[in-house]
A protein has these predicted regions:
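Substrate-binding/catalytic groove segments of enzymes
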Residues: 66, 234-237, 264-268
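Extended active-site neighborhood of metal-dependent phosphoesterases/phosphodiesterases
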Residues: 31-33, 60, 79-169, 183-205, ...
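Residue-level marker for buried hydrophobic side chains located in beta-strands
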Residues: 39-41, 71-73, 107-108, 171, ...
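A short C-terminal boundary segment appended to hydrolase-like catalytic domains
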Residues: 248-312
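N-terminal secretory signal peptides that target proteins for export/translocation
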Residues: 1-7
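N-terminal active-site segment of His-dependent metallophosphoesterases
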Residues: 25-86, 147, 152, 180
């Protein structure tokens, strides 16, 4: 007996074979990879106080829902004594679970830090006051020493920025070039030294500490600036009303979580009580937009003077 619907069966068989071929071809390709980069930020953290440990607990707990790959330190990593027991109390003990799980910390030097911290292996500074690393293919991170910005550091920074072909260029250091803080405020000399290079070579975001609060600055010439200096120190009520502030928080301690996708910077600032105090998704400015913002970047950065060193 002949099949009742030979044409229909033949068509069905062809579709099935085509589907199997497509599936086999898809299996030859590697699975989709999450190209985003996640990291955390702490600043002015090294006190050994209960506030540092409280922030550290929330930082550790957040990794279960936000699996960050490393932590950037904004300076003032160790206040006061820096003997071996101080390193244990102010760094190794509060962040032990992260260190044991292989999370790397990358430090910058603050005004309360001894330069010899750069030789402490868990800070991953490789013995340098300033350095750069590439955590993922489209991201390059630049750690600077804002305590003393000499011509050698500026020349190094320009060379590294120029050589970087990364889409995302992230800088971090201690002293803020834009700030609404009543104690310190914006470091205009540092801004005059660094901003022309940031503009010329398309830096996307800058993270800083020193001010013991959280502040997200309104975009400045196509660059996003954040102050995150409250991981163990707090200067309550210190933020002044200025036109710089997009969001500010000076009534509690905090840390930050950052995610970089192909074209967005997603962020959260989280208090020591686990409350999200600021969050958002910021678009990466295009190369064309950056070139437009860099109109004044051709001006040479001022050379450092005897007052360039910062110890306040």
């Amino acid at each position: 007996m002949q099949p009742r619907h030979p044409v229909r069966l033949t068509a069905t068989l062809c579709l099935l074979l085509a589907s199997l071929a497509t599936f086999a071809g898809a299996q030859d390709k590697p699975p989709a990879v999450d190209e985003s980069l996640r990291f955390a930020i702490i600043g002015d953290s090294g006190t050994g106080s209960s506030s540092q440990y409280r922030v550290a607990e929330k930082l550790i707990a957040s990794r279960s829902s936000f699996p960050y790959e490393f932590v950037l330190m904004m300076g003032d990593n160790l206040y006061g004594n820096e003997n071996p027991s101080a390193y244990q109390k102010k760094f190794e003990r509060p962040y032990k679970l992260l260190l044991d799980s292989g999370i790397k910390f990358y430090a910058s030097l603050g005004n309360h830090d001894e330069p010899n911290q750069r030789f402490y292996k868990p800070f991953n500074m490789s013995g340098e006051r300033y350095y750069t690393f590439k955590p993922k293919g489209n991201v390059r991170v630049f750690a600077l020493d804002s305590n003393y910005v000499d011509q050698k550091q500026l020349e190094w920074l320009e060379k590294e920025l120029k050589a970087s072909g990364s889409d995302w260029k992230i800088a971090f250091f201690h002293h803020p070039v834009y700030s609404s803080g009543g104690r310190h405020g914006s470091d205009e000399m540092l801004r005059a030294q660094l901003e022309p290079l940031f503009l010329k070579y398309g830096v996307d975001a800058v993270f800083q500490g020193h001010e013991h609060f959280y502040e997200r600055i309104k975009p400045q010439k196509g660059i996003y600036y954040f102050i995150s200096g409250g991981a163990a120190k707090l200067r309550e009520g210190n933020i002044q009303k200025t036109d710089l502030t997009a969001k500010a928080f000076d009534t509690g301690y905090h840390f930050m979580l950052i995610e970089l996708t192909k074209d967005k910077l997603n962020f959260q600032a989280i208090s020591d009580l686990g409350k999200v105090i600021d969050s958002g998704s910021l678009p990466r400015f295009s190369d064309e937009q950056k070139k437009a913002f860099a109109g004044d970047a051709a001006l040479p950065a001022p050379k450092p003077t005897a007052t360039t060193g910062r110890n306040k």
